[in-house]
């Protein structure tokens, strides 16, 4: 006769511990339970977390450490955080469905293992004029090269994020999707290309994908939690403040840092975070929610014969039309889809003629403010028709120009105010003019931190640093230097900065001169493009100092570039390649490979926009 064994006697918990655990997790969802299991697994992997004398029975842990054969690899290729959020939501959906998934940033993905992937999901954003997210550049380059392997045993799906105000909308997503298919991979689901209002499309895509994968992949048990551990550990330090739940901070300082004669209006902005506990690191960005200019709202309403007091529904809430336009919809960015929809409503011949010529349509949208398009082709619309044209308001991201080692409960940003004229009428950027013109000291401002682990100072404070940041691209390097100063970092620092004029546009001049005097800033090279007959830019200074730049690289220097993605960043990269060819003794192909290796080693990082 065999005596039955109580199930609880097999557990490494006492009855009291089991009761407490059940009470604590009784109201947890399946996703939360999976997250918690992964969190605990991650804890025991950390050195020192197994108590002396404690034993772990192999029989009780075997299932937790067995990696399933068909693991879903989910790659997040994010520039501003949106792709990362979609990927995290998909991961949570898959975990809730008990499907094994490994979420990895594109910058951390060992892309040469792609030939072994069975199930591959990519959420990819596009930056600038069709470029992949900075963290995905190496993966994108590898996949589109001759080195990419056949993927006949791989099934995949791609979700692309972009902005229809740019010509090459969602190009990175299209590139990944098309190339994976070319390499023989099976498409699980048609690619989705989402605009800035991506949430509904993303939710639908996630639901469809989970259904497809549930029919294809065996449901797993504890292995899911083990695979989720990496993501779980990342989330325990997350802030309660986010894009959807921003901090109500205090607007503290608005100081113009360009001279009276400058063609540019650049502001140093300081925001008081109070006792919120909101934390950030050098390299992070500040997300800023803003309101449109009431004068612009009124101008648009009058052109469309609307009063502004019409009741409309926004996210299920009734609002006056004027308030909805002020706080919930983009008014300072025109796009080709908006022009197309407005042409259909207005039946304006000039606008309709653009529809057959995509380049002309895109150019018109980029050059013509929305309100001026309406002025050129006025038509009487209902409030609902107007809102149906517009995109939801999105926050703007600014590279943080301070370190909390110095600024403590403040966050600083450097804002180039967008101002221009269109047919004799003054126009301005939505967020930049909000910060420069419409906020007063002590006003509330809604902000959040967008973390950027792809733009970080070296872990070793003795490592040399080369910083290349013309214009407002200097912002994160102010944060870098504050941090290096506070850390007593012994590594050398070299700044390349450029702007039109020395006397009018030398941003934070006194601070840089102090760092030079104190010896913290080893070198500073300045390029003033309009102070002489021939224009000089930072890329020219890089070539001029190429021999020493190469010596620094050979000594392990980390390279950082911040600023304009469309021209400056490309020109700087060409200059760096020229330096590597000339002083490194390589041909162009070898130089390109060398720079790619620096990127993979996190020694070449860019924050471009």
UniProtKB/Swiss-Prot annotation:
GO terms for cellular component: cytosol. Disulfide bonds: none annotated. Residues 72-210 form the Flavodoxin-like domain. Its cofactor is FAD; FMN. It catalyses: hydrogen sulfide + 3 NADP(+) + 3 H2O = sulfite + 3 NADPH + 4 H(+). NADP(+) binds at residues 529-530, 535-539, 571. FAD binds at residues 332, 366, 396-399, 414-416, 420, 429-432, 609. It is an enzyme of class 1 (oxidoreductase). GO terms for molecular function: flavin adenine dinucleotide binding; FMN binding; sulfite reductase (NADPH) activity. Its EC number is 1.8.1.2. GO terms for biological process: cysteine biosynthetic process; hydrogen sulfide biosynthetic process; sulfate assimilation. Alpha(8)-beta(8). The alpha component is a flavoprotein, the beta component is a hemoprotein. HAMAP family: CysJ. This is Sulfite reductase [NADPH] flavoprotein alpha-component. The gene is cysJ.
């Amino acid at each position: 006769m065999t005596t039955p064994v109580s199930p609880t006697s097999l557990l490494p918990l006492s009855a009291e511990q089991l009761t407490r655990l059940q009470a604590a997790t009784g109201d947890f969802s399946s996703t939360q339970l999976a997250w918690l299991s992964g969190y605990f697994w991650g804890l025991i992997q950390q050195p020192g977390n197994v108590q002396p004398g404690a034993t772990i029975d192999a029989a009780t842990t075997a299932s937790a450490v067995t990696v399933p054969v068909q693991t879903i690899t989910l790659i997040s290729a994010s520039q501003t955080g949106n792709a990362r959020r979609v990927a995290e939501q998909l991961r949570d959906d898959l975990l809730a469905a008990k499907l094994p998934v490994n979420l990895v940033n594109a910058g951390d993905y060992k892309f040469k293992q792609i030939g072994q992937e069975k199930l591959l999901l990519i959420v990819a954003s596009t930056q600038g004029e069709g470029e992949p997210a900075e963290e995905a550049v190496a993966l994108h380059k590898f996949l589109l090269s001759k080195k990419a392997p056949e993927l006949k045993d791989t099934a995949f799906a791609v979700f692309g994020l972009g902005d229809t105000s740019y010509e090459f909308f969602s190009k990175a997503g299209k590139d990944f999707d098309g190339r994976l298919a070319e390499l023989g991979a099976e498409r699980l689901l048609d690619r989705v290309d989402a605009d800035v209002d991506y949430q509904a499309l993303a939710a639908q895509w996630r639901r469809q994908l989970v259904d497809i994968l549930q029919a294809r992949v065996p449901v797993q048990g504890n292995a899911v939690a083990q695979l989720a551990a990496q993501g779980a550990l990342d989330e325990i330090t997350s802030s309660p403040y986010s894009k959807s739940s921003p901090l109500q901070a205090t607007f503290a300082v608005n100081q113009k840092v360009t001279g009276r004669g400058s063609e540019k209006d650049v502001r140093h902005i300081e925001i008081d975070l109070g006792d919120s506990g909101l934390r950030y690191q050098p390299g992070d960005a500040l997300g800023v929610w803003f309101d449109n200019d009431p004068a612009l709202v009124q101008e648009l309403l009058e052109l469309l014969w609307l009063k502004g007091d019409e009741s409309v529904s926004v996210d299920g809430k009734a609002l006056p039309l004027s308030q909805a336009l002020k706080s919930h919809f983009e008014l300072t960015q025109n796009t080709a889809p908006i022009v197309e929809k407005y042409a259909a409503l207005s039946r304006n011949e000039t606008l309709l003629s653009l529809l057959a010529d995509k380049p002309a349509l895109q150019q018109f949208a980029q050059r013509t403010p929305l309100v001026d398009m309406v002025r050129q082709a006025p038509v009487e619309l209902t409030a609902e028709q107007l809102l149906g044209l517009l995109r939801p308001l999105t926050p703007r991201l600014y590279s943080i120009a301070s370190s909390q080692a110095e600024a403590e409960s403040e966050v600083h940003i450097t804002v180039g105010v967008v101002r221009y004229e269109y047919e004799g009428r003054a126009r301005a950027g939505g967020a930049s003019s909000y910060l420069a013109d419409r906020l007063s000291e002590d006003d509330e401002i809604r902000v959040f931190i967008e973390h950027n682990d792809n733009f970080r100072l070296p872990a070793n404070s003795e490592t040399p640093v080369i910083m290349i940041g013309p214009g407002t691209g200097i912002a994160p390097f102010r944060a870098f230097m504050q941090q290096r100063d506070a850390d007593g970092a012994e590594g050398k620092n070299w700044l390349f900065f450029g702007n039109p004029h020395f006397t009018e546009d030398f941003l934070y001049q006194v601070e840089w001169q102090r760092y030079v005097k104190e010896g913290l800033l080893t070198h500073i090279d300045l390029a003033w493009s309009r102070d002489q007959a021939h224009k000089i830019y930072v890329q020219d200074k890089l070539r001029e100092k190429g021999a020493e730049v190469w010596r620094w690289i050979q000594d392990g220097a980390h390279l950082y570039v911040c600023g304009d993605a469309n021209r400056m960043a490309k020109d700087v990269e060409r200059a760096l390649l020229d330096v590597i060819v000339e002083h490194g003794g390589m041909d162009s192909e070898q130089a390109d490979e060398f720079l790619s290796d620096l990127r993979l080693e996190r020694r070449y990082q860019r924050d471009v926009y």
